[in-house]
Amino acid sequence: MDKKWPAWIVLGLIALIAGCALGLTNEVTAPVIKEQALASADEARRAVLPAATDFEEMAVDNDDIDYCYKGLANGETIGYTAQITVKGYGGEIEVVVGVDNDGVITGINVGGANFSETAGLGAKTKEPAFTEQFKGLSAPLTLKGNVDSVSGASVSSGAIVNGVNTVLDYVAGLEK
């Protein structure tokens, strides 16, 4: 006697097996993804405050700032790095800013895991032609004043400038 299983049972078993496989894959890859994210954040901190040899995480009391680290060299504070997430034209943009003790920008890093700006336009905000112009500047920054916009990406360029100004204001208020 040939007995067929109802289609809903077969479909349910396939869904159960697929769900278990996805859950197992997530369980195995989650620690690796977290480790890579931490390494990427550390690399960004070191790029924007290159004189620092160590970083010490600080408590953040500002909802706009994602995190802030004190940059140290020979046990002395030489500056700060902070990350802010701003809303660009294509979505969220993570901006890591390095600032020395005098409030002067030592570098910025633009991007993030969810960076989805338009290729050839907003994506150019990640390029050195845009990010390098921030080095040596201090607050207040203005688009078309002391920072040039990326052509065709004024929304994203403006969001980044506003985010950097927010970080500069935050760092200026820290006890040094």
Where are these regions (language model features)?
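Flexible, solvent-exposed loop/hinge segments and secondary-structure transition points
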Residues: D2-K176
